[in-house]
Amino acid sequence: MNKIKILGAVAALSITLAGCGSSASSTSSAASDSGKSGKLRIKFVINGNLGDRSFFDSAYAGLKRTEKDLGYSLKVVELGSDRTKWASGFEDAASGDDYDVLAAGTFDTVDFISKLAPEYPDKKFWLFDAAVDYTGKSGCSNKCANVYSVTFKQNEAAYLAGFLADKLVTAKALPGSPGNGKVGLMGGVKIPVIEDFVVGFKAGFKAAGGNPSSGVLVQYVGGDNPFGDPAKGKEIASAMYAQGADLVWPVAGSSGLGVFESAVAAKRYTFGVDSDQFRTLTDADQRQTVVTSILKNAGNALYLAAKANKAGTLAYGRSAAVGLAEDGVGYVDNANFDKLVPAALRAEVKEQAAKVKSGAVTVPSAF
């Protein structure tokens, strides 16, 4: 059975990265008159699409649980990958009277939520993996009193990934890999939240004894659809493997799906991100490339936020930041992890996690 180091705290929420596809659509598992039924109604507006087998899919799974367990109703609006349509899509979603809570995530949605929250003061807004400005100096004219936002200390989990990566490649522990002491990290685009992954990863790589300047290859998908371009992700990963990388870690939403394809072709390895991608990937060969996944468990975070919201204890008008100490981020310890990572190294990673939690190790951040 998978033992997953994942979220707990009621103050947790998360998210990063737009999915694939381009057309806007909506789905609902609630009746159109759900407002009359007395159910609390969540509208999940995605600046992208479901199907990334990572971040947004995790969020959706958590929100679906609220229907069964907490009596919420859920409507999902997928805005697609065309950024020029996101502003109007959020306007349309917020203008409807078919929700009590509008949930959205990533840095790209901050301006939308900041504008809409004061316009709809009787509604609640959840923003994950980014935070609005609560001072009133910019953004929300009402100081975002009806907005709850949460950021994650992804740098702490990335530190563990970097530590593990260096130890694996230095020991030449991954079967069939060249053992050149190199790894790759593919980000979606160079923004603070992605840079936080990079900074943490390099710090962990260095702490394990590696040289991040020569041992960590970093590249960004970029373009018009940085978090929804699997073809570009495959191209970048293939180039990294050709440069001698034993493994590549995609931090780029569904662009990362191309990395798993490339890993199979190159007979190399990967780390997953945001969800347990050993579990969510459907291709058996791709699954075997996933040594571990570094988690921001959006689904559990949203579920816990919904639980607190229903109880009247969710703190609006402020933001929270959660990391390893709060079980806000973590890593997957499953059968594939046990198979590919020697027991002594598994113990070292656990020890490093404990040091970060206790404050004995302070991980640098891009923020």
Question: Where are the language model's segments positioned?
Answer:
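Bacterial N-terminal signal peptides that target proteins for export
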Residues: 1-8
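Bacterial lipoprotein signal-peptidase II cleavage site
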Residues: 20-31
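A residue-level marker of the well-folded mature domains of exported/periplasmic proteins
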Residues: 30-367
